[in-house]
Amino acid sequence: MTVLHSVDFFPSGNASVAIEPRLPQADFPEHHHDFHEIVIVEHGTGIHVFNGQPYTITGGTVCFVRDHDRHLYEHTDNLCLTNVLYRSPDRFQFLAGLNQLLPQELDGQYPSHWRVNHSVLQQVRQLVAQMEQQEGENDLPSTASREILFMQLLLLLRKSSLQENLENSASRLNLLLAWLEDHFADEVNWDAVADQFSLSLRTLHRQLKQQTGLTPQRYLNRLRLMKARHLLRHSEASVTDIAYRCGFSDSNHFSTLFHREFNWSPRDIRQGRDGFLQ
């Protein structure tokens, strides 16, 4: 597995924060690093396989990656993101207690993926741009300024994450997308789902299309197919069982949609013919 080292990304040995844009981020094999990072998805779509679990990421996704986590990107489509790198929560010169603002693992579950709405994403970009402008300066005031900006970034993300901000339709759409990640195999009635998240059906269609480039049903089908592809690669379940587990009632229809999406059949993926990045 590829290991990325801080010496190749941080501007100096005493720098606590570094900014690494990926505009765009291409498919990238599984790797880990000797530093931590916050991945901020600007726009586009892709699959982020995090510690073996696939997540669909779009504009507004924020992922917190620790130094022992392994992850990869695949099936990217104009995926543009910015990585905010930091050595460790306890390696800041002027800040202490940052760990309390970061996601916490509880009972083996780590809430690695958050979502923010478009207006918050704009504020995030501004903070990141300020940090990036100061990267070449190593004096104490500049170091303190970068660390303060990093603290502001964490506070903004925490206050604006799904769990704490459901006051507008964009935030409710983000909550809906997170719900689909857990309920993709369920039979989805879009009228009922729109009501569940206090959205009109028209608003749901419009905002989801704006954020992902896909209609709701097309997004759900892609999500199901992504989950199925992951199971084909990483489980011994039959194609039929995987189809049913991922929300398809007809394995032949599943195979047709799968081939249309990936240009490979489920059997091809199972046999590794697509040259999956290891």
Curated annotation (Swiss-Prot):
It is found in: Cytoplasm. SUPFAM superfamilies: Homeodomain-like, Regulatory protein AraC. It comes from Shigella boydii serotype 18 (strain CDC 3083-94 / BS512). This is HTH-type transcriptional activator RhaS. GO terms for cellular component: cytoplasm. The lineage of its organism: Bacteria, Pseudomonadati, Pseudomonadota, Gammaproteobacteria, Enterobacterales. Activates expression of the rhaBAD and rhaT operons. Pfam families: AraC_binding, HTH_18. The record marks D241, D250 as: Interaction with sigma-70. HAMAP family: HTH_type_RhaS. Its main location: cytoplasm.
